[in-house]
Structure formats: structure tokens, C-alpha cells
Amino acid sequence: MSVYDFTCTTMQGKEVSLSQYKGKVILIVNTASKCGFTPQFAGLEKLYKEYKDKGLEILGFPSNQFNEQDPGTNEEIQEFCKVNYGVTFQMFKKGDVRGDNPQPLFAYLTKEKGFKGFNMDHPIAPKLVPMLKEKHPEILEGDGIKWNFTKFLIDREGNVVER
């Protein structure tokens, strides 16, 4: 099994087989529009523009599971991303990325690449980890997605190589 075996729905409601990305490097990101990490959209878009002609695809998957930081509709989220960050990479419809009913793609990704710990050198991590311990200790358990903007790097053969 690989990411190419999954079909996901775009913000526009179109079903897309991830097999269309065969031979490309894919960065899959769970996103949110009202998060301390939201400015990462700018860096992701810059990365996409710089490397898309060399075979990079970035796929964004909004989720409202972490402190309800993406409460808008798919249309509102897409508009926010375009207006504020000029996002041109493919965004998919909002859905769960962890818990009892995650999107199948995210169940697969987290099974393939478990959680290795937070990067405590990141300026937000020293604030995020204590908040999670206090308010959402269940998030810290297991290999599920821990917060917004978790990234999975997929190689040109469809293998999950990094989280």
C-alpha cells in the first residue's frame, strides 16, 4: 500500500486519486487558518512555487480538531488561504486527521510514520506542550497527529519517508 491508493476530495468537491502524483515528491500538511502556525502557509507557498516545476506537490488538509482553529467552511478556508497567503497548491476539504474517525489517508500516514516528539527548539513548542498536557492530554498519547501543520514527506515512489 502507498499514498497512491487513496482518493481525497478537493475544496471544490472533486474526487482526486493521489495516484495522479506518481513520480512527484509530495508534502502532505494538515492545516488551520486560526493557529499560531498559520503563517506557515507563506513558507509552504514559497516552497511550492520554487520547486513545483521540479516535481514537488504540496497538499493541504484543513482540520478543526485542535482548539477549533479552522471553524470556517471549505469555501471560507480556501478564500482565507488565497487572500492572505496567495496559496496556489491543492487544498482538500476539511476533515478529521486524528481520533476515532480520521480521514483514511491520515490513518495510513500516522501508521507509517509514528510521532518522534516535539522539536523543543521551535519557539512555540515550549508553550504548546504544557498546554496540551493540561487541556488535551489525550492528544499526547500514541502516534496520532498532535497539532496543526504536521507534515509528511512522500518520495517519488509513494513511500512516507519523513514526518
Where are these regions (language model features)?
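A generic fold-level signal
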Residues: M1, Q20-K22, D53, D100, ...
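N-terminal "domain-start" segment that seeds a small globular fold
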Residues: M1-S19
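Short loop/turn microsegments at loop-to-beta-strand junctions
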Residues: V3-Y4, I26, N148-T150
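Conserved helix-turn-beta segment immediately C-terminal to the redox Cys motif
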Residues: K24-I26, S33-K34, T38-P62, C81-Y85
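Thiol-based oxidoreductase modules, predominantly thioredoxin-like and allied folds used
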Residues: N30, K52-N74, V87-G99
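Stable alpha-helical elements in mature extracytoplasmic
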Residues: Q40-G43, T73, I77, N101-P102
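Thiol/selenol-based redox catalytic cores and closely related redox-interacting motifs
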Residues: F80-K82, G86-R163
